[in-house]
């Protein structure tokens, strides 16, 4: 809510997996009611749910209909890769694991390792950079986070990116990892 995200969609396969995924759906609604009851009553927060296979299609056709998505691990693996592809691939998608009870958090790239291109100056650092942006926001360092976000947006608008993204940009200028990092630092 503090980030102006007022709709939560619980993505599940509860129609088939009634106890596990159906339980997740019930838990999600119960948690929202317990933690955000007043916001639900006032309409400030809307919680709905969607069967995962329908969500996969709808998210491609009408992404603007979704703001915050909560799902279980297996569905999340499919959903996160599909949605990352919509914005350039997993090389740009940030990730975070946050325990909202303790406040402990880990921010990380959403993808795994790529040993086949290690040391070749080909890696897109945007995922880990944007994960750091999320960390800065989480810590309340919003101005620093915004400076980095603005710098990345400037580069992407100019068509400056690593090869995995530049190939999709009109007049894209593909840079290696180090050169891209240097350009980002200059753009700050």
Please describe what each predicted stretch is:
Residues 50-57:
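Short acidic loop-to-helix transition motifs that present clustered carboxylates
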Residues 58-160:
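Glycine-rich phosphate/nucleotide-binding loop
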Residues 1-50:
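Glycine-rich phosphate/diphosphate-binding loop of Rossmann-like nucleotide-binding domains
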Residues 14-18, 22, 45-49, 68-69, ...:
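Hydrophobic alpha-helical scaffolding
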Residues 1-2, 14-17, 147, 153-188:
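Glycine-rich phosphate/pyrophosphate-binding loop and the adjoining helix
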Residues 27, 31-34, 135, 151, ...:
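Generic, well-ordered alpha-helical scaffold segments in large soluble proteins
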Residues 21, 25, 125-129, 177:
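Short alpha-helical patches at coil-to-helix transitions and adjacent helical residues
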């Amino acid at each position: 809510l503090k980030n102006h995200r007022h709709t939560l969609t619980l993505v599940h396969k509860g129609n088939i997996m009634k106890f596990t995924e159906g339980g997740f759906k019930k838990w999600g609604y119960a948690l929202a009611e317990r933690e955000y009851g007043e916001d639900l009553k006032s309409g400030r927060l809307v919680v709905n749910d969607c069967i995962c296979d329908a969500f996969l299609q709808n998210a491609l056709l009408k992404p603007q209909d979704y703001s915050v998505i909560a799902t279980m691990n297996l569905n999340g693996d499919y959903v996160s890769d599909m949605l990352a592809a919509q914005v350039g691939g997993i090389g740009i998608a940030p990730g975070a694991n946050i325990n909202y009870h303790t406040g402990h958090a880990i921010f990380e790239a959403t993808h795994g390792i790529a040993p086949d291109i290690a040391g070749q100056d080909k890696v897109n650092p945007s995922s880990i950079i944007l994960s750091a942006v999320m960390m800065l926001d989480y810590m309340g360092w919003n101005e620093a986070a915004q400076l980095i976000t603005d710098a990345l947006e400037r580069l992407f608008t100019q068509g400056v990116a690593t090869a995995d993204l530049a190939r999709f940009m009109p007049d894209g200028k593909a840079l290696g990892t180090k050169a891209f990092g240097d350009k980002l630092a200059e753009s700050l």
